[in-house]
């Protein structure tokens, strides 16, 4: 017989998250006008304070040295399942996409300077970010087909291209952007690199919010025209954008 029950320590955390959602998050969310952005923001800020200072439920996926709970994949699965029962649940725990994945990526790939400038605000909940990889013409789930191109110009990179379904782009303080930097790589998976793009920036143009079956939820189409990014903002090594992207999108 296979026992699918959680270890007791994971079950304790799951129940803790469930109680928070039932006692605080769901009632607060249902009590406001959810179409009123100001009410939504105030509610999330208040609940985040409770999560962090009273409940001990903050950054469940990040290590303790970054203010997190240091949970592994099994515990995170339990936490995510409970938090997702209320639409703002992951936001309240500072464990929402796309920031959660970007936090992992910056932690693993970032230089000390990049971590302090970009990861620290994400962990403190004072900034949001986005991940810009998907393109409308060719590169959806296959990043070897990315056409957005970056070329070196002194101590900067100049980037041109077209992205869409970039979740969280509107209001983000920075983007992790995947662009092609190699015209003739040895293998297709070595063509791309990743850049940290400060936002807003000249050359980063939000065209529209691409609606899904449930409406518009800040999944943006982006035109990128002569966008200049400092060379110091390359995340990981040149040609490692595919590897970084796979790490970013993994569990």
Task: Indicate residue ranges for each PLM-predicted region.
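N-terminal glycine-rich flavin-associated loop
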Residues: 93-113, 142
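Glycine-rich beta->alpha junctions and the first turn(s) of the following alpha-helix
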Residues: 4-6, 194, 204-251
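A short, Trp-centered hydrophobic/proline-enriched beta-strand micro-motif
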Residues: 125-134, 178
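Short glycine/proline-enriched turns and hinge-like loops at secondary-structure junctions
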Residues: 71-72, 141-144, 168-173, 187-191, ...
């Amino acid at each position: 017989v296979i026992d699918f029950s959680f270890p007791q320590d994971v079950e304790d955390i799951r129940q803790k998250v469930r109680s928070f959602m039932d006692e605080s998050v769901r009632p607060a969310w249902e009590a406001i006008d959810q179409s009123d952005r100001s009410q939504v923001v105030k509610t999330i800020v208040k609940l985040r304070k409770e999560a962090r200072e009273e409940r001990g439920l903050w950054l469940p996926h990040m290590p303790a040295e970054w203010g997190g709970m240091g949970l592994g994949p099994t515990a995170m699965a339990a936490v995510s399942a409970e938090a997702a029962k209320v639409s703002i649940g992951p936001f309240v725990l500072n464990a929402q996409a796309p920031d959660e994945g970007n936090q992992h990526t910056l932690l693993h790939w970032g230089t000390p300077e990049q971590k302090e400038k970009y990861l620290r605000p994400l962990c403190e909940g004072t900034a949001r970010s986005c991940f810009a990889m998907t393109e409308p013409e060719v590169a959806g789930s296959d990043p070897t087909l990315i056409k957005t191109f970056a070329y070196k110009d002194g101590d900067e990179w100049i980037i041109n291209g077209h992205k869409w379904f970039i979740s969280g782009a509107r209001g983000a303080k920075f983007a992790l952007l995947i662009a092609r930097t190699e015209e003739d790589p040895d293998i297709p998976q070595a063509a791309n690199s990743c850049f940290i793009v400060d936002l807003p920036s000249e050359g980063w143009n939000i065209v529209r919010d691409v609606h899904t079956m449930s409406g518009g939820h800040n999944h943006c189409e982006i035109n990128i025209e002569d966008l200049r990014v400092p060379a110091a903002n390359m995340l990981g090594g040149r040609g490692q954008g595919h590897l970084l992207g796979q790490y970013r999108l993994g569990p």
